[in-house]
C-alpha cells in the first residue's frame, strides 16, 4: 500500500480549485483511469487506503510529485491567516490560499533548515504589543519607528525598496498563485501572513498580477504590521486589526515627522501627486495618513476623496511606481539546489528540489518570479504557470540580499 497522507490529497485538490468530482473527471481524462469521486472522498476521510496505482494516477493527473502526498504537515487554521474575507469571498478561494500558504511555509522552512539559517527574527516578538484593546495612532507610530530601525532604514525619509528591507531582516516576501492570479477568482485581499505562527521563518504572501507598485509596497508594509502588532492575541476584532495594520503601513512608509513637514490642510491634490512620486505611496493612502495624524480635517479629507473619485483615480492614479520583485527565496533555492548565476538569476536542479520539497516546480518557479532549470539545458522542460505579463525590474547587485545577509544560527 502507498503511504498517503489523506490531508495532503485534500490540500492539493483545494489548491487547484478542484472538487472531488472534478478531480475524478481529470483523472479519467488525462490518465484514462477511473477513481470515482466517492472513493476520493473515502480516501480523504481515511476510510480506505489509497493503492500505489491510484496514488500514481492522482499525482500524474494533478502533476504533483509523489513525495507531496507522503509528507506530514501541521494543519493551518484559516483564522491564523490575515487574508481579509468579505461576504463575496468564496470558501474555495480561502481554502486554496490556506493550502498554498501551508505548502509555501513547509518549503521555506525546509530550505531554511537545509542552509542553517536563522528562523523568526527576535525583534518581531520584542516589538509586539501585549496589551488588550486597540492601539492609538501615536503608539503605532512609535512601534513603526522601532521597526524601521530593525529594517535598517533611516528614521526619516522614503523607503527605497520595501521588499528588500523586509528580506534583509529575514522576512520572506513571496507572490502567491492562489491570490487572484486567475481571472476566474476575484481577490478580496492583496496580502497574507500568519502572525500567530511562532515556528519557522515569517512569510508575507502577496498578489502580483494587475497591482500597481505603490499598492504592493503598502500591502507588504501592511502585512508587516500584522506580523508585529498581532503576534500575540490582544482581543481585537478583524476590523481593529486591519485598521492597526493600515496605520502601521502608513507610519513605516511615511513617518510622522515627514508627514507633518510635507502635508497640511492646504495641500492641493496636484501636490499629492508630486508627493506620491517622491514617496512611492498612493495618493489615497497619503490622504488617509494625513487624516490619521490630524494634518487635514474631516471636511478636507472628504473633499480630496471626492476629487480622487471624480478623476477616476480610484482605479488608476497618475504616477507609476516601480514594482518591487523579491529575491531572497530565489537565492535560497539556488544555494540549496543549484547555483546563483547573478543577483536576479538562479539555476536549480529541478528534480532534486521538487523531490526534496515535495512541491511542483511550477509553484517554486512562481514563488520566485522565475527559476532556470538545469534539465532545460538538455531539452527537458518543466511545466510553468502562464506568464502574467508582469515586467521584471532591473535591480542593482549591491541592493540584493543573499542567504548570507540573513543571520545564521
Where are the predicted features?
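Active-site hotspot residues in diverse enzymes, especially metal/ion-binding acidic/histidine motifs
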Residues: 1-409
Amino acid at each position: 500500500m502507498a503511504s498517503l497522507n489523506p490531508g495532503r490529497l485534500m490540500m492539493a485538490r483545494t489548491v487547484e480549485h478542484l472538487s472531488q468530482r472534478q478531480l475524478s473527471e481529470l483523472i479519467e481524462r488525462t490518465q484514462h483511469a477511473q477513481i470515482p469521486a466517492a472513493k476520493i472522498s473515502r480516501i480523504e476521510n481515511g476510510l480506505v487506503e489509497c493503492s500505489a496505482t491510484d496514488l500514481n494516477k492522482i499525482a500524474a493527473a494533478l502533476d504533483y510529485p509523489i513525495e507531496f502526498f507522503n509528507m506530514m504537515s501541521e494543519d493551518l487554521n484559516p483564522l491564523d491567516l490575515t487574508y481579509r474575507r468579505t461576504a463575496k469571498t468564496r470558501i474555495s478561494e480561502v481554502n486554496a490560499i490556506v493550502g498554498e500558504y501551508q505548502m509555501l511555509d513547509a518549503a521555506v522552512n525546509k530550505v531554511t533548515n537545509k542552509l542553517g539559517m536563522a528562523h523568526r527574527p527576535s525583534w518581531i516578538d520584542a516589538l509586539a504589543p501585549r496589551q488588550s484593546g486597540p492601539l492609538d495612532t501615536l503608539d503605532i507610530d512609535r512601534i513603526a519607528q522601532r521597526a524601521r530601525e530593525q529594517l535598517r532604514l533611516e528614521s526619516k525619509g522614503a523607503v527605497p525598496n520595501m521588499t528588500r528591507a523586509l528580506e534583509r531582516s529575514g522576512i520572506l516576501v513571496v507572490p502567491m498563485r492562489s491570490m487572484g492570479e486567475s481571472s476566474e477568482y476575484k481577490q478580496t485581499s492583496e496580502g497574507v501572513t500568519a502572525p500567530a505562527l511562532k515556528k519557522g521563518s515569517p512569510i508575507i504572501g502577496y498578489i502580483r498580477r494587475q497591482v500597481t507598485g505603490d499598492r504592493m509596497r503598502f500591502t507588504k508594509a501592511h502585512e508587516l504590521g500584522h506580523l508585529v502588532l498581532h503576534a500575540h492575541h490582544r482581543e481585537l476584532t478583524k476590523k481593529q486589526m486591519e485598521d492597526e495594520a493600515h496605520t502601521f503601513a502608513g507610519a513605516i512608509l511615511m513617518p510622522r515627522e515627514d508627514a507633518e513637514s510635507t502635508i497640511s490642510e492646504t495641500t492641493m491634490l496636484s501636490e499629492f501627486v508630486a508627493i506620491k512620486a517622491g514617496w512611492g505611496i498612493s495618493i489615497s493612502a497619503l490622504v488617509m495618513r494625513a487624516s490619521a495624524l490630524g494634518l487635514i480635517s474631516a471636511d478636507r479629507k472628504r473633499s480630496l476623496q471626492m476629487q480622487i473619485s471624480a478623476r477616476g483615480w480610484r482605479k488608476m492614479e497618475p504616477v507609476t511606481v516601480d514594482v518591487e520583485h523579491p529575491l531572497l527565496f530565489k537565492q535560497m533555492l539556488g544555494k540549496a539546489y543549484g547555483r546563483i548565476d547573478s543577483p536576479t538569476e538562479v539555476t536549480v536542479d529541478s528534480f532534486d528540489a521538487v523531490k526534496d520539497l515535495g512541491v511542483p516546480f511550477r509553484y517554486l518557479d512562481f514563488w520566485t518570479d522565475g527559476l532556470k532549470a538545469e534539465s532545460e539545458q538538455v531539452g527537458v522542460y518543466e511545466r510553468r504557470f502562464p506568464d502574467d505579463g508582469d515586467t521584471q525590474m532591473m535591480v542593482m547587485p549591491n541592493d540584493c540580499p543573499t542567504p548570507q545577509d540573513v543571520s545564521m544560527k
